[in-house]
Amino acid sequence: MGGIRPRVDTRSKILTLAAALELRPPVAIVSGYFDVLRAEDARELGRVRHHPLLVVVLPVADEILPPLARAEMVAALRVVDYVVIANYGGLDRLVEALKPVEYTRMEGEHAVRRDRWHQQLMEHVDRRHIN
């Protein structure tokens, strides 16, 4: 059995937009809402792990978790090197400045999945209140 690993404060992976714009290529960028972070997200982020990985947490209407909480959860994943909370304008600036070797947008998938998850959650709550 290995020794005890030191705790790492993964919040240090969370950068300001200005700091993220100073990153050196090559870098991969993945953007999304990550509200709620799911296993599929972790698998997708692991798939693009061939270069330093910058994840951009975007705003979403009717959020379940605030942006900082979502950024902290994403930063806790071992495959993620950096996280930035940004709006779409900030995302565009990052893509233009960093010219990522890989760029994956997950927000469309997140929106569909979030709506489905929200519906399932509401149905579950309704069933629990009936019984």
Residues of each region from the PLM?
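Nucleotidyltransferase catalytic core that binds NTPs
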Residues: 1-131
